[in-house]
Amino acid sequence: MYHVPVLLEESVSGLNIDPDGVYLDLTFGGGGHSREILKRLKDGCLIGFDQDSDALANVPDDSRFIFVNHNFRYLRNFLRYCGYDEADGILADLGVSS
């Protein structure tokens, strides 16, 4: 079941997306935030984290997106593994899903 994020526009606008930047979605889940971030990227990269294997069904087929099926506590390691020293923005939807 797809979850429509609350305050989607406000959350993503707050990142002030650089079309060529590197962004992290630490709570990929249904992919709603990630899809919106990808709409705003040109040549940038988005790395999405989710340790829940159910999230795999929501991974977009997009060369600018990298899915990491692990807890985001490893974000620094995976960021470096993907060839980046730092990110331009991080989104984490830490609310309760109902």
Task: Report each predicted region and the residues it spans.
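S-adenosyl-L-methionine
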Residues: 1-20
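Long, charge-dense, solvent-exposed interaction surfaces that engage phosphate-rich ligands
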Residues: 85-98
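SAM cofactor-binding core of SAM-dependent methyltransferases
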Residues: 10, 19-80, 91-92
